[in-house]
């Protein structure tokens, strides 16, 4: 079966999920900062830790699929963004402006190519670029900034602005959120094995 992953539903669905994930990550960054219990070292260490997992994914995918290995995927992005966003964690309206600019810039960079790979992390792709996972700084940093702005608005001083009753039956979703990194690391090999066996059966 020929499935087109470059357009249509198969293109839009993973990006919609990623947008929600990155937006919530921005809200979480704002929440952790407003607690007053963490400083830059926390974000630097956390960012480096996530980025190192991204590098591990790079090495694994290079060994498995060298023609489309992951050079700057969502873990690379989240690791870098966790550090770069630190000076903006207290900002509200300005983050909306910067977020919008970042998103527009990201779409503009889609039309730009370069003969070298050094600007991949910004959103400038080299010629004939193929990868399994790609989340450059632009436009995705803009989505994160919008999430930070939302977090600062809805949770000022680490308190919920809008009163909502607790929903204990949603605790499984909270568990998934607290362990999202491990879930991401596990889901890729599981999906690859699933697709492999489905391909064998068809």
Report each predicted region and the residues it spans.
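Alpha-helical transmembrane segments and their immediate juxtamembrane cytosolic regions
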Residues: 1-202
């Amino acid at each position: 079966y020929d499935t087109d992953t470059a357009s249509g539903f198969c293109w839009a669905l993973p990006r919609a999920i990623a947008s929600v994930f990155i937006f919530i990550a921005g809200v979480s960054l704002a929440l952790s900062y407003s607690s007053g219990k963490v400083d830059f070292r926390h974000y630097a260490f956390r960012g480096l830790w996530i980025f190192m997992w991204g590098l591990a994914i790079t090495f694994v995918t290079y060994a498995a699929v060298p023609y489309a290995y992951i050079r700057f995927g969502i873990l690379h992005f989240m690791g870098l963004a966790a550090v770069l966003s630190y000076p903006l964690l207290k900002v509200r309206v300005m983050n909306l402006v910067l977020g919008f600019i970042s998103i527009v810039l990201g779409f503009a960079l889609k039309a730009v190519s370069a003969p070298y790979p050094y600007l991949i992390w910004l959103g400038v792709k080299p010629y004939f670029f193929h990868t399994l996972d790609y989340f450059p700084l632009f436009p995705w940093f803009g989505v994160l900034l919008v999430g930070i702005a939302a977090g600062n608005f809805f949770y000022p001083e680490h308190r919920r602005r809008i009163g909502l009753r607790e929903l204990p039956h949603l605790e499984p979703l909270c568990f998934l959120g607290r362990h999202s990194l491990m879930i991401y690391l596990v889901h890729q090999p599981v999906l690859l094995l699933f697709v492999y066996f489905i391909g064998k059966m068809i």
